Regions:
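Conserved beta-strand segments of the P-loop GTPase G domain that flank and frequently precede/overlap
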Residues: 40-45, 70-73, 118-120
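Switch II (G3) loop of P-loop NTPases
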Residues: 2-25
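Canonical P-loop GTPase G-domain recognition
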Residues: 74-148
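A conditional alpha-helix N-cap/helix-loop micro-motif detector
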Residues: 21-22, 50, 96-99
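Inter-motif core of Ras-like GTPase G domains
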Residues: 20-47, 56-67
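P-loop NTP-binding site
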Residues: 119, 131-138, 151-190
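Short amphipathic alpha-helical segments
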Residues: 21-22, 52-55, 82-84
Length: 190
């Protein structure tokens, strides 16, 4: 890494493939989730079947709900998909309304701590919003490694500011902890 910090991204298998696989994945999720700083729960914009996602949320993920950021993906495929403005890299008004309805529906269903973000990786639409949401959702110690690996166009001033604030917060906590340990040690000696 060279910066003294690291970023590990793990792509876990999605749910809903089969009952046998879901049971296997449930065990995997229970084992690995406590080790993660953040889970990006991806839901395709045109996917209406969310019952398996809902089951996993309620029974596995909800305990660590502050660690989950829901992302509606493939926003450019939202109906009417032929209306996507490729030149302006944005949805048509009808698509924008449908995307809002989808993110609202995901929010109502899962009631996450963090806002639901919609993106189109193919077109780059709202990736900066996703990065900002990631910076907000990640614990302070994990935001700095993300910042160092972002493409320049995603390092907006807002993201840079968030990274500075989170780094300062992490350093402050380290000093507070060190000070508490020193005070406790002195108190025991006296």
């Amino acid at each position: 890494s060279g910066h003294g910090c690291s970023l590990v991204i793990a792509d876990l298998p999605g749910v809903g493939e089969s009952r046998d696989r879901d049971a296997e994945y449930e065990a995997l999720y229970r084992d690995i989730l406590p080790e993660l700083d953040l889970v990006l729960w991806l839901i395709k914009a045109d996917d209406r079947a969310l019952s398996v996602d809902e089951y996993f949320w309620r029974h596995i993920l909800h305990r660590g709900h502050q660690q989950v950021l829901f992302v509606v993906t493939q926003a450019d495929k939202t109906e009417p998909c032929h209306e996507w403005d490729m030149a302006g890299i944005q949805p048509s008004p009808a698509q924008a309304q449908n995307i809002r309805e989808k993110t609202d529906a995901v929010f109502r269903l899962f009631r996450p701590v963090h806002p639901v973000v919609a993106v189109s990786a193919r077109t780059g639409w709202e990736l900066d919003t996703l990065v900002s949401a990631l910076m907000t959702a990640l614990p302070d110690h994990a935001a700095s490694p993300l910042m160092t690996r972002l493409q320049d166009e995603l390092r907006t001033e807002s993201v840079r500011s968030q990274a500075r604030e989170q780094f300062t917060g992490a350093v402050d906590r380290i000093f507070d902890t060190a000070e508490s340990v020193c005070i406790a040690s002195v108190a025991r000696t006296v």
